[in-house]
Amino acid sequence: MSFVVIIPARFSSTRLLGKPLVDINGKPMIVHVLERARESGAERIIVATDHEDVARAVEAAGGEVCMTRADHQSGTERLAEVVEKCGFSDDTVIVNVQGDEPMIPAVIIRQVAENLAQRQVGMATLAVPIHSAEEAFNPNAVKVVLDAEGYALYFSRATIPWDRDRFAKSLETVGDACLRHLGIYGYRAGFIRRYVSWQPSPLEHIEMLEQLRVLWYGEKIHVAVAKAVPGTGVDTADDLERVRAEMR
């Protein structure tokens, strides 16, 4: 099947300045992400960035770049600018791969594209089971609850669903109901155009989760269990050191 990967790569990260260009075992991080995307079989891969140094690193690795504005409030807004500049048709399948995921398995990039293509829905994503209490109660691990057809009912930083009887006895173990959302999305290009036309929702401001805008406006997001679990993403300097060690 045909799909396009867009990799947003913002230079000015608040916790790790110049994050796309940090060195991981001899290559900029953004080049590692580009290589994982190439392994997915995508028809086209575009790095969307607001910084010339990132663009030069990508082009030196043979990648395609789309220069975007620096004032976007979200990664989806950056995607929308690329969609318009490239003139993608409304039914084009777009996969948003985060620029700080150098260990993302190529198989899940393709999985989210295929899941979207098989359904009459504008957006799809992935999740993995949560097995540890530490992760279940960590607000940085976003949880998702699904309906019977695999569509998201809600995303939250809180522990959902709350296993009342189990947690009344102990907070040391979790059951099989908790799923951690992975930050990879598939969209149809026309859906991205609609998304950025909507006003931000109160829930997304409360949780700081932009995907809640979709549910707020009554749209569906399909969620499948990922075929592989991504490695560590890079948000902090400590994450960077872990990734360097894991990728040696």
Curated annotation (Swiss-Prot):
**Chief location category:** cytoplasm
**Known EC number(s)?**
2.7.7.38
Which UniProt keywords are listed? Cytoplasm, Lipopolysaccharide biosynthesis, Nucleotidyltransferase, Transferase
Q: SUPFAM superfamilies, from UniProt? A: Nucleotide-diphospho-sugar transferases
Metabolic or biological pathway:
Nucleotide-sugar biosynthesis; CMP-3-deoxy-D-manno-octulosonate biosynthesis; CMP-3-deoxy-D-manno-octulosonate from 3-deoxy-D-manno-octulosonate and CTP: step 1/1; Bacterial outer membrane biogenesis; lipopolysaccharide biosynthesis
Q: Which domain of life is it from?
A: Bacteria
Q: Where in the cell is it found?
A: Cytoplasm
Q: Which reaction does it catalyse?
A: 3-deoxy-alpha-D-manno-oct-2-ulosonate + CTP = CMP-3-deoxy-beta-D-manno-octulosonate + diphosphate
Which sequence ranges are marked TM in the entry?
Answer: none
This chain belongs to which protein, by name?
A: 3-deoxy-manno-octulosonate cytidylyltransferase
